[in-house]
Amino acid sequence: MGEVVTKSGGAVHTGGQPLEVSKDGLRFFPGAGAVIGPLNALVNWGRAGSIWPVTFGLACCAIEMMATGAAHHDLDRFGIIFRASPRQADCMVVAGTLSKKMAPVLRRVYDQMPEPRYVLAMGSCACSGGLFQSYAVTQGVDQVVPVDVYVPGCPPRPEALFDGFIRLQEIINKEQMRWSPWR
């Protein structure tokens, strides 16, 4: 019941409960278990609501990253579940200082992730090299892999990582679907 959507995009009331319309144009039919909307919006809604990051903890920021998965903060309630394998993940959280010797390993893990893939740089060291201005330290993860979201701080609190994931969800919701994985 509720409303019927016409070809012009307007909704005609037919009685019963009204439709719930989200900000991205999806129409939810309460009680019917149905969703109507553009294909991009439906796919992005599903992908943004179920981010599966692989952790790449390199230093003290990794402790704060682990705290976000613990009971007090609980990332699972947002649909964010840490994965053990990059082949099952769609996001990589790089937390800490990236040495030049570790850079090829980071690139290899990134290449093993399926498309679409995202990178979240957590902490000052991952964002810009931090205090370690050295010949042995990469000055930012973005020199090795493309970074989508930067979470600054030394170390950033779990709430800052939450904010980074929310920004990543906003990026995912604005994307257009790619029909070919080979581009």
From Swiss-Prot:
Biological processes annotated in GO: aerobic respiration; electron transport coupled proton transport
EC top class named in words: translocase
Pfam families associated with the record: Oxidored_q6 (PF01058)
SUPFAM superfamilies: HydA/Nqo6-like
Reactions catalysed, as given in the entry: a quinone + NADH + 5 H(+)(in) = a quinol + NAD(+) + 4 H(+)(out)
UniProt xrefs under InterPro entries: NADH_UbQ_OxRdtase-like_20kDa, NADH_UQ_OxRdtase_20Kd_su
Cofactor: [4Fe-4S] cluster
Recorded topology in the membrane: Peripheral membrane protein
Main subcellular location: membrane
Annotated Gene Ontology cellular component terms: plasma membrane; respiratory chain complex I
EC number: 7.1.1.-
UniProt entry keywords in alphabetical sequence: 4Fe-4S, Cell inner membrane, Cell membrane, Iron, Iron-sulfur, Membrane, Metal-binding, NAD, Quinone, Translocase, Transport, Ubiquinone
An example molecular function term from Gene Ontology annotations: NADH:ubiquinone reductase (non-electrogenic) activity
Binding note for cofactor: Binds 1 [4Fe-4S] cluster.
4Fe-4S keyword on record: yes
Compartmental location: Cell inner membrane
Residues the record lists as binding [4Fe-4S] cluster: C60, C61, C125, C154
Known role: NDH-1 shuttles electrons from NADH, via FMN and iron-sulfur (Fe-S) centers, to quinones in the respiratory chain. The immediate electron acceptor for the enzyme in this species is believed to be ubiquinone. Couples the redox reaction to proton translocation (for every two electrons transferred, four hydrogen ions are translocated across the cytoplasmic membrane), and thus conserves the redox energy in a proton gradient.
Family of the protein in this entry: Belongs to the complex I 20 kDa subunit family.
PANTHER family: NADH DEHYDROGENASE (PTHR11995), NADH DEHYDROGENASE [UBIQUINONE] IRON-SULFUR PROTEIN 7, MITOCHONDRIAL (PTHR11995:SF14)
Complex formation: NDH-1 is composed of 14 different subunits. Subunits NuoB, C, D, E, F, and G constitute the peripheral sector of the complex.
Stated name of the protein: NADH-quinone oxidoreductase subunit B
Organism name: Desulfovibrio desulfuricans (strain ATCC 27774 / DSM 6949 / MB)
